[in-house]
């Protein structure tokens, strides 16, 4: 299992672009220095009325297949 941590700050306007279909993937830079690409549906459980803000931990299998995403703050 691999773990990657990153901060995410998406405003309500940015989330609306995602919901309107303008983006299917989200690209973030992990604190470990890697560029990570996530399907936007992985962040939906964390969307609030004002957007998505927080510190997250992405867990993947050794071949980088998704296991879980959790907010850790």
Q: What does each model-found stretch correspond to?
A:
Residues 16-53, 57-62:
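Amphipathic, hydrophobic secondary-structure cores in small proteins
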Residues 1-13, 39-44:
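Charged, amphipathic alpha-helical segments
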């Amino acid at each position: 299992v691999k773990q990657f941590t990153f901060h995410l700050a998406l405003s309500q306007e940015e989330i609306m672009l995602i919901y309107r279909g303008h983006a299917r993937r989200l690209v973030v830079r992990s604190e470990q220095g890697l560029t990570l690409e996530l399907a936007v549906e992985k962040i939906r459980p964390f969307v609030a009325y004002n957007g998505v803000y927080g510190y997250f931990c992405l867990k993947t299998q050794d071949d980088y297949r998704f296991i879980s995403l959790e907010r850790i703050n």
